[in-house]
Amino acid sequence: MIISKTPLRMSFFGGGTDFADYYKNSRYGYGTVISTALDMYVYIMVCKRFDDKIRVCYTVNEFVDSVDQIKHNIIREALKMLGIEKGIDIVYSADIPLSSAGIGLASSSALAV
């Protein structure tokens, strides 16, 4: 079982200036980002199942037979990248409501950790 706790982040300045496309093509050079970690967290719990099913729990519960059936884009693509095809439980929660539209506190970045 793996459990992670990652702080959410608030950016004050420089949102996309740290992307290579910006600093390689900008006349200003490298980007500058000012942000801070918050005292609110994203929690992830991952454990092996004893069958071949995949269960993903966040604001909805997904119980599927294959990785391709997972609706949560980040989790689906992370499992594909890692070569995990079956037999896993993933629970994703946070101290704030999570939304697929984004909340501006880097919850998807925290999930990637």
Regions found by a protein language model. Give the residues of each.
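ATP-binding N-lobe of GHMP and related small-molecule kinases
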Residues: 1-109
